[in-house]
Amino acid sequence: WVTDSTYIHTLKDGWTYLSTIQDLHTKKVIGWKFGKQMTKELVIETLDHALLNQTPSENLIIHSDLGSQYTSEAYEAKLNELNIRHSFSRKGCPYDNAGIESFHASLKKEEVYPSKAYENFEAAHLALFQYIEGFYNRKRIHSSINYLTPNQMEELALQA
């Protein structure tokens, strides 16, 4: 799994924060939370959401950058409790986390920037839900997974 957070601007509420977890094998966004503040609680809630959607394999590794939320004692304790190993990008090297960075770039190019501006937090939240759950996981094909959608790839992986 890979995880990161990105900024989304709204007219009324200013900067808001999207935290996501992606399964690198299927390209599926398996956990995401949207908040008005970038906190360790937001990334822990994202992890909880991912765990509702997918049971981690025995030797699961989650990769993140060195952001304070991901290096917090609370986040590390949660990962330890779940027996999930944590790997980190090198300082100042976003390429180490290219999978999730690529998802965020696609999200911004395909949804955020074309929309010009979201009126408020709620409007942004609805648009993100529609993009992630309605389009990205269900309809967006990826050449790296043989032109399947993330949901189709997940189904194949579960059958194997």
Functional labels for PLM-detected ranges:
Residues W1-A160:
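Charged DNA-binding/catalytic regions of mobile-element recombinases
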